[in-house]
Amino acid sequence: MGIFTIASQHIRFAVKLASAIVLALFVGFHFQLETPRWAVLTAAIVAAGPAFAAGGEPYSGAIRYRGMLRIIGTFIGCIAALTIIILMIRTPLLMVLVCCIWAGFCTWLSSLVKVENSYAWGLAGYTALIIVITIQTEPLLAPQFAVERCSEIVIGIVCAIVADLLFSPRSIKQEVDRELDALIVSQYQLMQLCIKHGDSEEVDKAWSGLVRRTQALEGMRSNLNMESSRWARANRRLKAINTVSLTLITQACETYLIQNTRPESVTDTFRELFAEPVETVQDVHKQLKRMRRVIAWTGERDTPVTIYTWVGAATRYLLLKRGVIGNTKISAAEEEVLQGEVVIKAESAERHHAMVNFWRTTLACMLGTLFWLWTGWTSGSGAMVMIAVVTALAMRLPNPRMVAIDFLYGTIAALPLGALYFLVILPSTQQSMLLLCISLAVMAFFIGIEVQKRRLGSLGALASTINILVLDNPMTFHFSQFLDSALGQLVGCFLAMMVILLVRDNSQARTGRVLLNQFVSAAVSSMTTNTARRKENHLPALYQQLFLLLNKFPGDIARFRLALTMIIAHQRLRNAPVPINDDLSAFHRQLRRTADHVLSASSDDKRRRYFKQLLEELDVYQEKLRVWEAPPQVTEPVARLVFMLHRYQNVLTDN
């Protein structure tokens, strides 16, 4: 799409962004706020951020959720700033350095929490730094400054939310309904591929695509939950559908793997049933009814366990899907499905990556402090703030370098655009509030169009331009002050980008190895006779880690197959009829301890030693299963697991 083109679907959000900025400006001046610029800047960032991420108008609830995160982050940052000032007001240099460490700590935390919640911690880090830097000349005004910042940011967020509600926000419900129908058809087609036992590359492409779509549906569920409380019932059902969809993928892929060694396990009856093509959800529903009749006639024992489980999961999917689309009262049958299992959350595999982010942010802020003190530049503080903002917000995203470049382009574009407004437009509007609002609305409208196109530098240009304009009360026009602010932003972004480029993040290989070992640990831990452990649902957490693996190593099919095999082993062993006795229970605990040692080992040598010990213990465990006459439903998945661990031993132990 060209830089000068305006698509019709982009106009509504551009008007919404302009309205949010104008409303924040009007309220700020009407109530005689000290710095209305903060309210305007907050309204712009809260409204434009989700649009840039979505590549279009954000769905209903996204702006409100981002606003709530900004309020939480601001309050945490203000409390931290006041605490640091109270404890270290007599040592200004130490106070600033501790603030740099606080910014790094918040970046570390934001790297470990869910991506959608990381914004609050990133904001908490640089908010404290902004307050500490701003009150250097008058430290006794810190409480007043913190209260003013909180109140003006809340006003900006309220204005953004009001503008969002005024222009009928887009509901994601119809997208959810369409995706639910399309997803079950794709699930059926994956099962057809697996039963045909065709090309492995085609199967890999199909299941990895379904993992991404299931993850995307979970993101839609979060948006729907933010949209309105009336979707609470749909939200509960969609949570369960996430697990059901992942179960369908797992059972289909296990069907494919079983046929590698035992192609006769899938009977001709089911091959014929799955041979019929399906195009719509009605076709899937019709086929499932036929399969349930066949299963009822032939009996569960004569039905392959993966197909039996798959048909049951697909039936539950259709039941829950119907409830989501109609948003009806939850029936007794649905309630039984919804209360089935306790979902376990995934443990972060990016601790080393988080520590790299901590050092990047801390070093960048300290470098800014040294630059400020060494040069004595009046806008060194502005450069420091930009360093903190760029590093705090960039680190959690997949490509921090591109975020830094986006900010750098934005600050470069803000220099001529800001100069036009500062020297020509704003001085001409001093006698009319209406003209001032119109002038800013025009700028917001056109930048809002570019933000939705995800134009590089557009979001940074919007924030940087508003930041250097004199939207204070009263407005004063000193060109030297404007130039200092603009250059301070530019230098800050450049220094932040240099730190991101120089402090390399070599944690990718380590993260990949940790993820794979987490899959191994989950598979080993599923060997248990404890009823409570068996009821724990690890599937969403395991697929969340698989999704991270897909993003970290795109195209590495061997890793994906290994991870998927571990997930299949986990699911099969979790439901396997393991003989119940004290001997096996004690050995299960020993296996879990050894798997935990592999996961937490601090060096490659220790990891290899513990992994070798785990393989030896698994050989002993297989012998114990033979002694206790365990059925094939137990011995076969254990043998498959041991074979995979032997085959990929180097990948699982070496960095």
Curated annotation (Swiss-Prot):
Q: According to its UniProt record, where is this protein mainly located?
A: membrane
Membrane topology type: Multi-pass membrane protein
TM segment ranges: 13-33, 38-58, 69-89, 93-113, 121-141, 152-172, 370-390, 407-427, 431-451, 459-479, 482-502
* UniProt cross-references to Pfam families, sorted A to Z: FUSC
Question: What is a biological process (GO) this protein takes part in?
Answer: carboxylic acid transport
Give the Gene Ontology MF terms in alphabetical order. Answer: transmembrane transporter activity
The text of the family note is:
Belongs to the aromatic acid exporter ArAE (TC 2.A.85) family.
Role of this protein: Forms an efflux pump with AaeA. Could function as a metabolic relief valve, allowing to eliminate certain compounds when they accumulate to high levels in the cell.
Please give the name of this protein: p-hydroxybenzoic acid efflux pump subunit AaeB
Organism, as annotated: Enterobacter cloacae subsp. cloacae (strain ATCC 13047 / DSM 30054 / NBRC 13535 / NCTC 10005 / WDCM 00083 / NCDC 279-56)
Q: Give the encoding gene's name.
A: aaeB
